[in-house]
Each structure stands twice: as structure tokens, then as C-alpha cells.
Regions:
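Short catalytic-loop micro-motif centered on adjacent basic/acidic residues
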Residues: 73-78, 102
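Residue-level preference for the first positions of well-ordered beta-strands
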Residues: 2-6, 30, 71-75
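A short, structured active-site edge motif that brings together acidic residues
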Residues: 35, 102-109
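Conserved beta-strand scaffold positions in the cores of enzyme catalytic domains, especially
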Residues: 29-31, 100-103
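Acidic, metal-coordinating catalytic cores used for nucleic-acid/nucleotide bond scission
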Residues: 76-89
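Conserved GTP-binding G-domain of TRAFAC-class P-loop NTPases and closely related GTPase folds
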Residues: 1-4, 8, 13-16, 21, ...
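Conserved substrate/cofactor phosphate-moiety recognition/catalytic segment
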Residues: 13-72, 111-115
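Amphipathic alpha-helical transducer elements in NTP-driven molecular machines
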Residues: 51-59, 83, 107, 126-133
């Protein structure tokens, strides 16, 4: 049975590092990442204009992988702090009967995420990470009520 691991956390929390290590240990695993798709479509720049395309391509790629394999593991290596985004991923997974696991990186302190991000070639920026942290607080509050 196929398995999808949805990574969740702020930029700089270690999601991509974890995903790369997972793939070293599990060479048949796939990583889907919207940042990588943005690089192909828009030179890595985020824009509202292309973001819907990026999300649609990621969902389509997930569907293609799940339909084309029997025992794949797919890592969704994005922040995944938006409930609508997570629900869209879950719909694809459920429709194709894939096992789903959430792997969160919520334990990484905000200041550490900001520091790690500042060392990147293309940093997201502290104001964006702080804004995403506010989304994360809302997300965790919603999840705790389930």
C-alpha cells in the first residue's frame, strides 16, 4: 500500500533536511515540494498568479505517483499549515486509498527557524515566518479541538 507523509512546520524547521535524509535511507521514496515546482515555473519566486498552478501540479503529481505505484512513500515537503491545502492532499490520498501520516516540526522554536532561514540563499524572511507562526498557532488550536 502507498504511504504519504505530510510534513508540517515553519520554514527553517528542518522539514527538507529530514525529507532528504529519509530518501537517503529509503531510495524509492518521492519528495514533492512546491518550492521546487516554483523554481521550474517562476524562477523560484512566489506569486499569487502562479500559486494555484503550483498547488494543482503538486496534487496532480501526487495522484500520478499513487496511481502508478503500489508501495511508494511520498513526502509532501511543504509548510502545510493551511487547512485547505492539507484537506486537498487528504482528498487525493483517501480517493486512492493511501496511508497518510502527519510529521510535524512544531517543536522547533520560532527564533531557530528565523535564524536558519536567514542563512539560506533565498530566505523567506522573518516577517513572513512570524506571520506563518500565527497561522501555525491557529492550526494547532483547530487540531486540538478535533
Amino acid at each position: 500500500m502507498n504511504k504519504v507523509i505530510i510534513l508540517q512546520g515553519l520554514p527553517g524547521s528542518g522539514k527538507s533536511t529530514w525529507a532528504k535524509q529519509y530518501c537517503k535511507e529509503n531510495p524509492d521514496a518521492f519528495i514533492l515540494n512546491r518550492d521546487s515546482l516554483r523554481k521550474m515555473l517562476n524562477n523560484g519566486e512566489w506569486s499569487a498568479k502562479t500559486e494555484e498552478f503550483v498547488k494543482a501540479i503538486e496534487l496532480s503529481a501526487l495522484e500520478i505517483i499513487l496511481k502508478g505505484t503500489d508501495n511508494a512513500t511520498v513526502l509532501i515537503d511543504d509548510t502545510n499549515l493551511n487547512l485547505k491545502t492539507v484537506n486537498n492532499l487528504l482528498k487525493v490520498c483517501n480517493s486512492l486509498e493511501a496511508d497518510v501520516a502527519l510529521k510535524d516540526f512544531f517543536h522547533v522554536p520560532l527564533h531557530e527557524c528565523i535564524e536558519r532561514d536567514s542563512k539560506r540563499e533565498k530566505p523567506v524572511g522573518s516577517s513572513a515566518i512570524i506571520r506563518m507562526n500565527e497561522e501555525l498557532i491557529k492550526f494547532k488550536s483547530y487540531i486540538s479541538k478535533l
